[in-house]
């Protein structure tokens, strides 16, 4: 975050200076989502630079900055990408179990409302990513907890096919 400026990365600059209360309570979920997506679009250039510096060839990467519309132009012919999209119920359940979430929520005026806004925003973000990926004919795997980890791994391996070597 030290290399961002209000001029070049306005969303990153704005969000990086918000309190948790501002981030999750004082703005509508729609505004949160709009600014969240703008943040990730700005951050994508930094992520891409790091990936290009470290890897020459296929890469496995994760992060909200890797929006399908931003990744797509960088895929070489024959390369594939898949987005694992959490179901809202799955995400709410697992986020509520993370100890650091409580620390963040305790910094807000209304922890229950903040959590609900956060999870609603994230559910809408998941829908946004899923729609982008499908529009570009990129892979999507919905994660809802209905299959175990090995089944998820198997599904991803099947999507990518046999390793090239």
Task: Place the predicted regions along the sequence by residue.
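NTP-dependent small-molecule kinase module
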Residues: 124-165
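ATP-dependent NMP and nucleoside kinases share a basic, alpha-helical "lid"
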Residues: 52-55, 59-108
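Short catalytic-loop micro-motif centered on adjacent basic/acidic residues
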Residues: 34-35, 59-61, 140-143
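Short, hinge-like loop/turn segments at secondary-structure boundaries
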Residues: 6-17, 78-79, 101, 159-160
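Conformational switch/transducer regions in large eukaryotic molecular machines and scaffolds
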Residues: 43-52, 69, 136, 141-142, ...
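Conserved nucleotide-sensing/catalytic segment adjacent to the nucleotide-binding pocket
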Residues: 2-58
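Alpha-helix-centered segments that form part of catalytic cores
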Residues: 31-47, 113-131
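A solvent-exposed, charged loop/short amphipathic helix patch at secondary-structure junctions
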Residues: 16-31, 98-115
